Every structure is written in structure tokens, then in C-alpha cells.
Amino acid sequence: MRAAHLVWAALVVASAASGASAAQVGVHDPVMAKQGARYYLFSTGPGITFYSSTDLTTWKPEGRVFKEGPAWATRAAPTFDGHIWAPDIYHHDGKYYLYYSVSGFGKNTSAIGVTVNTTLDPRSPAYKWEDQGPVVQSVPGRDLWNAIDAQVIDDAKGTPWMSFGSFWGGLKLVKLDAGRTRLAEPQEWHTIARRERPAFTPDDEAGPAQIEAPFIFPKNGWYYLFASWDLCCKGKDSTYKVVVGRAKTITGPYLDRNGVDMARGGGTLVIAGDSDWRGLGHNSAYTFDGKDYMVLHAYETADRFKQKLKVLEMGWDRDGWPVLDQKDLNRYQSALQP
């Protein structure tokens, strides 16, 4: 997320505003994992904030992943201030890999790092995050892509891939090595989604190609690529929305419902804002206990457009496209556990 830290204030939001729902969890860019009977939620914030829950509704604050920013972060992003963006949590072979982004606002002076733990339970004696450093870095003037908003997934053969990107030349997919902490060699890159970037846009500017936050979700022989279009983090003026395409292979092409390649500007709308909720986006998607869910943030009109967590059950139409019920935005309300 390019601008989350400009409006990110308190992760725990309580408001006395008329009609507002109090004591909900306020997050940007939420991702989840389940260990045992407990869910863990990670989000953009100082040091990466996280919560735990047993029911996906009531959440207990668990502090921060990083007490101090990664030691290498200011070398990659000299203006880094400890505010870590867009985490992704991934489990493999008994380890949890937490990918995250450091960046300079409005520039592609960015990098994606990863830290590893054997447990998500902060009360376990085995709990210890061990940072592995940067996985990939973008440099202004060299790269026409932005190394933020990572998601990692294994394909059907067990090969790990990282999708990422924001604005510039769109969303990328790159193969990871067997250790899941570095790019595989020889490197293999794909552009999986983009929007039109006008010619002669300076390379060091994000430009108006408003797309970011890829998330690939496998289902029934398809890979579904979710992405966020338009603008986050502008309160009532936020225009974020979630779009999707799908492919039979993880490298694409990802086609929307009309057969348009997302790498050529395609994308089928999944959910957008309404009068009660603005700026829906930066979603993740999971299957928990046989049900599919979309997890995202949204800004609540009745609470001065503060960011709130949304966990929405996701269905599928007869043609195999994801379906959400807009009314669930009001039905789902997280609760902060004291």
C-alpha cells in the first residue's frame, strides 16, 4: 500500500460518533493464518501489528512483530521510519514466513523482506522471529516496478512464487528458491496484471496506472488473481475496489470474465465501496474449516472514514467466479478483546 501511513492512526478504533460501531479492529492490508484453533491477523503498521482470535470476530492485540525495524531497511529505503507495509504470512515445512515491505512514500525506493518463526503463538517458548533480510528490491531509475505488496504461494508442483507490485508497470510474479527467502536462479519473471501507463510518464513516478496488492488463490483447478484498483487511503475520497481474473497455470494469462487478460488491463469487479463503506481493498483470501473467506479493509462512513477489518464469506457462481454479499460489510463487525 503506497499511502497507508498517511492516514494510519490507531490500530484499535473506538468512536462515539453517532451510528459508528465502537471497538472494532482498525487495520490496513490484513492477512491471516490459522495455527491450531487460533487465527492470527497481521497488518500494516509500526513493526507489523498483529492480533489473535478463536472465532474470526473477537480479536486480542498481540503487539508487534518487530520491536525495532529491520537493520537493513534504511539501506533499501533511506526514509524508512519503522512503519512496515503490507505483510503476507505463509506456512511451509513447519515454519511461518512473514513477508513485508519497506518503502519511501510515492517512490519505488522499496524492498520486500522476510522473517521466519516456528510458531505464531507469542506465549510459546519457541516464539522468535528471525529476519532473513531482503528478498527483492526496486530502485528508481532502474526498475519500472515497485517491490511492495508481496504474496507467496506454491503452485500445484510445490514450486514457490511471489507476486507483488504497486502502480508503475503493474503486478509481477517471480519464482523463489527452495528456501523461500531469495529469488530462484536463473530468475523467472512474469507480468501478471497491469493498467495503462501513459507514454512519457517519468520512470521515477508512480503514474496513474492504479493497481496493486496481488493475491493468488487456488480453487477447483484455477488460480484466481485478486488485485486492488484505484486509490486507497484517502478517507471519503478513497476509490479502492477488488477485481479478479483467473488462469489454469500460475504464470497466467489471468483472464477476466470477458476474456480480457489482466496484463492488458482486464479485471472483473468483485466488490467496491458503497455509502456505508469506502475504499474496500488490499484483500487476502483463505479457506478455513471448509469455508472460503475474503479478508480486506474498508473505511466506515459513520466513523469518520476510519479503517476497519472485514472478513467476508466468499461464494462461487455457476461459472466459477467469486461472489460476495455487499450486505456482509455491515453484518461483519470485529470486536476488540480488552
Regions found by a protein language model. Give the residues of each.
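Bacterial N-terminal signal peptides that target proteins for export
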Residues: 1-7
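N-terminal signal peptide c-region/cleavage motif recognized by signal peptidases
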Residues: 14-18
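Carbohydrate-active catalytic/glycan-binding domains of CAZyme proteins
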Residues: 19-338
